[in-house]
Amino acid sequence: MSDPGFLAAPVLLLLLVSLASASLEQAASRDDDSAERPLSKRHSEGTFTSDYSKYLENKQAKDFVRWLMNAKRGGSELQRRHADGTFTNDMTSYLDAKAARDFVSWLARSDKSRRDGGDHLAENSEDKRHAEDVNALLDRTMAKTFIEWLEKQNSNDQTD
C-alpha cells in the first residue's frame, strides 16, 4: 500500500465521480430554472390577459349603459321614427289598393266600351287606326304599370 499509484487511482476516481455529479446537478437545476421560467411567463401573460378581458368587459358595460341612457333621453325620436314608418307603410298600402281599384275599374270600362261598340267614335278608317294605336299604347302602359305594381307588392311581401 505504500505505492502512490494505488492511492491515486481511487482518489482520481472519487474526484471524477464528484465532478460528474456536480455537473449533472447543475444541468438539472438549469432545466428546473428553464421549466419555471415559461410557467411564470405563461402565468404573467395569463394574468395580463385576464385583467385586460375584465377591463374590456367593464368598458363594454359602461358603453352599453351610456347607450341606454342616450336612447332613453331621445326616446321620442325613436317613437317618431316608428310612427313615420307606420304612416308611410299605411299610405303605401292605401295607394297600392287605390291603384288596383283604379286599374280594375279601367279594365271594366274598357271592356264595357268594347262590348258597346266603342268604335262609334271613329268614323273613318284613319280614325280607327289612330284609336287602335292609342288603345294599344294605353294597353301596354297599363300592363307595364300593373307589372310594376305586382313587383312592388311582391317585394313588399318579401320584406315583411
Curated annotation (Swiss-Prot):
Residue stretch(es) of the prosequence: 23-40, 74-79, 116-127
Keywords attached to this entry: Cleavage on pair of basic residues, Hormone, Secreted, Signal
Protein species of origin: Petromyzon marinus
Cleavable signal peptide: 1-22
Molecular function in Gene Ontology: glucagon receptor binding; hormone activity
Gene3D superfamilies xrefs: 6.10.250.590
Keyword Secreted: yes
Function, in words: Promotes hydrolysis of glycogen and lipids, and raises the blood sugar level.
Classification lineage: Eukaryota, Metazoa, Chordata, Craniata, Vertebrata
Claim: Nucleus is one of the keywords in the record: no
Localisation: Secreted
Family: Belongs to the glucagon family.
Cellular component GO terms, alphabetical: extracellular region
One Pfam family linked to the record: Hormone_2
Protein's UniProt name: Glucagon-1
